[in-house]
Amino acid sequence: MAELKFKTKAQNLKNLQTKLKKAKVLPLVLTSLEELISNEDKVLQDIQTLKANRLIIRSSSLSEDSMKNSNAGAFLSLANIKADSKDELLKALYEVANSMPSKSDEILVQPMLENITLCGVGFSVDKDNFSPYFCLQYDENGSNSSITDGSSKSAKTYYHYRNYLEFKDIRLQKIIELIKELEVLYDCHFLDVEFAFAIQDDKEELFCLQVRPLVMHEKNNLFHSLPKEALYRFYKRFESLKESRSRVLGDKAIFGVMPDWNPAEIIGLRPKRLAFSLYKEIITDNIWAYQRDNYGYRDLRSHPLIHSFLGIPYVDVRLSFNSFIPKKLDENIAQKLVNFYLDKLNKNHELHDKIEFNIVYSCYDFNSSKKLEELLNHGFNENEIKRLEFSLLELTNKIINPRSGFYLKDIQKAYKLKERYDGIINSNFSLIDKIYWLIEECKRYGTLPFAGVARAAFVAMQLLNSLVEIDFITKEEKDDFLNSLNTVSKNLSKQTNHLNFHNKDQFLKDFGHLRAGTYNILSPRYDEDFELYFDADQKDSKVYLQDKAFVFSKEKTRALNALLKEHGLEINACEFFDFLKQAIEGRELVKFEFTRLLSKAIVYIEELGKYYDIEKEDLAHLDIKSILNLYSSLYSINPKEQFIEEINRNKKEYELTQAIKLPSLLCNADEIFSFYNHSIIPNFITQKSITAFTAKENDKDLEGKIVLIYAADPGYDYLFTKNIAGLITCYGGANSHMAIRASELGMPAVIGVGEENFEKYLKAKKINIECESEQIFCL
């Protein structure tokens, strides 16, 4: 039985004054507008009994803090009111009173808490799905409101699994013990608690500033969906993965959701089983390592890049770092290098989506000598650095070779995809056989070459960027070159720019296979839901495209030839620009072509579901291997029964995936149970500023608005045809598709702001993006 029942904010605190053991409650006076009007002097006398210099006057309405509606922040609260100024005090009392709907609504008066050392808000569960974590957000800047009003610049967010009893910070332990005590007093596991630590009489004390129930209306309740046994199994698995595997160097295991093949961006943080298994099948289980090996890096075949940790996709970062080491580099230097990378990332978590730019040396460029100097401060001698530099140069020359560069063969392979595609879809194969061969051909002629061309394109961008770094070309010249390229996405933008009912069929023939979520069966193709993506009646879009040839002067060409020779790059200026163009355009071309096969395979999976009377929403939970196995294995059990049994099991597992909370970068096993959410540094595109209303991707009216989308997925390219003002993505790195496209189009965008910031921006009606100063303001 509960000792206390939830009432108003003021009544809750009043009742807690004599009950609460784990924290203090400040003295308080309750009044109302009715009482103020009838007996103003008595109210003022009562307030003087608080013996405070400054006061905080807060609303305490019956329509606040209930089980059905929190109305958080709906009514007025005024802080730092002088207790000895009658006029100021009365003015504040009436202002707070008049902000509430009823004359009988309470006004809560308390002393201002001084000498605050830590202040924040704690939830006893996740506020959105009630998963079993204590979620604390706090600030140590001395403010009593920086967390609640969103003004904090140094807020910390801490998650702690409810059944985990170990703590590293005594203050966080005390806050959680306070929340647990409140749970017992109110017999309620779903609480929102405001707290503060402050120095009183030379001692730091914990204060409970407010408690209210979390509103549960129409929310998914995952409170019982995460058994501790699952987390302890995960803990043991992580511990075992610390041991280095065959051919893998490095002393520390780190896993992340955004490095390298960036699953958070491509399939999301909590993908359903079909999307996750497709990504693993066609790229991250085997294909990725084959191409790194082919392109001159360490042979890591048979090592899967991505692990599923209770349904969340994590890249093995140590393995990834190994895969960027030239295979001819001395083993001892390679070992030191991997450990240097791991240590740098461990100390700079914000770089986890920028490892190829800010951590690893994966190719030679015009600024390599200067960049490699940092290794002198980390235990490398000049001889080791020179050997690394030479290895990178040798590898880069192999990649960019205009006659034998692997990327040229890979681009040619992609041209076979159309023939393979037509052969399969026009065959008399069963649905299962068609799915099998689409996936197989997608791997052989699609994702295998794509992994290679994507690597070549990265090398191309690194070389191009380094020309800017050494002031050989300007940033504007770099942008002019990129804008001169004839990419698939540029062609898509041109086509949609003039899209109408007359050319709609041809447009869908060319681009209809694209979908916003490339691997997601629940994301419709362009040709399945045209109206969702496009408006055939739209006027020509003001797309930021400038079609002009890039011209390099003869003098500049001669200088580039000399520069290439000076750096030992075995290519001339014309061949150099041909490489940049072919690699960057080729990356988009190969991806565009392989997604045609993948997208059709997903269509056939949907048809297979219809045949077996299984809904698309359920098919999203089916592992692709369960379908592929049926190509060469016949079982006594009917495939429908087999699928449904697995779907039900995976659905249950997915509840656990939704409930679990993990850091974006997992460096230590104990972070499985408790961790801080580290700050994320977003990627600002262009130097422009823009102020506009916000819109979500599915809103009908996007013109002139800043659009917010979760992933920087290429399928969202259609947004650029909607005359949008700007773009913000939750996930995505500096090298993501949308970052590149926004840069090409000169559109202000912020890529990869992180979950916490993204949720804040979703609530803003209007946003100001200042790309030059790298700031975002909610207006």
UniProtKB/Swiss-Prot annotation:
Listed pathway(s): Capsule biogenesis; capsule polysaccharide biosynthesis
Record's keyword terms, sorted: Capsule biogenesis/degradation, Kinase, Transferase
SS bond partners: none
Highest rank taxon of the organism: Bacteria
Result of knocking out the encoding gene: Mutant does not express the MeOPN CPS modification.
EC number, UniProt record: 2.7.3.13
Database matches in InterPro entries: ATP_grasp_subdomain_1, PEP-util_enz_mobile_dom, PEP_Utilizing_Enz, Phosphohistidine_dom_sf
A molecular function GO annotation: kinase activity
NCBIfam families membership: PRK05849.1
Taxonomic classification: Bacteria, Pseudomonadati, Campylobacterota, Epsilonproteobacteria, Campylobacterales
Name of this chain's protein: L-glutamine kinase
Keyword Nucleus attached: no
Cross-referenced Pfam families: PEP-utilizers
One of the GO BP terms on file: capsule polysaccharide biosynthetic process
Enzyme class per UniProt: transferase
Catalysed reactions, semicolon-separated: L-glutamine + ATP + H2O = N(5)-phospho-L-glutamine + AMP + phosphate + 2 H(+)
Organism annotation: Campylobacter jejuni subsp. jejuni serotype O:2 (strain ATCC 700819 / NCTC 11168)
Active site: 737 (nucleophile)
Domain notes: Contains an N-terminal ATP-grasp domain, a specialized central substrate-binding domain for L-glutamine and a C-terminal phospho-histidine domain.
Keyword Cell inner membrane on entry: no
Function: Involved in the biosynthesis of the O-methyl phosphoramidate (MeOPN) group found on the capsular polysaccharide (CPS) of C.jejuni. Catalyzes the ATP-dependent phosphorylation of the amide nitrogen of L-glutamine to form L-glutamine phosphate, the first committed step in MeOPN biosynthesis. Also catalyzes the phosphorylation of D-glutamine, gamma-L-glutamyl hydroxamate, gamma-L-glutamyl-hydrazide and beta-L-aspartyl hydroxamate. Does not phosphorylate L-glutamate or L-asparagine. Does not act on L-glutamine derivatives with removed alpha-amino or alpha-carboxy groups.
UniProt-listed PANTHER family: PHOSPHOENOLPYRUVATE SYNTHASE-RELATED, PPDK_N DOMAIN-CONTAINING PROTEIN
More details: The reaction mechanism comprises three steps. First, a histidine residue of the enzyme attacks ATP at the beta-phosphoryl group to form AMP and a pyrophosphorylated enzyme intermediate. Next, the pyrophosphorylated enzyme intermediate is hydrolyzed to generate inorganic phosphate and a phosphorylated enzyme intermediate. Finally, the phosphorylated enzyme intermediate transfers the phosphate to the amide nitrogen of the acceptor substrate L-glutamine.
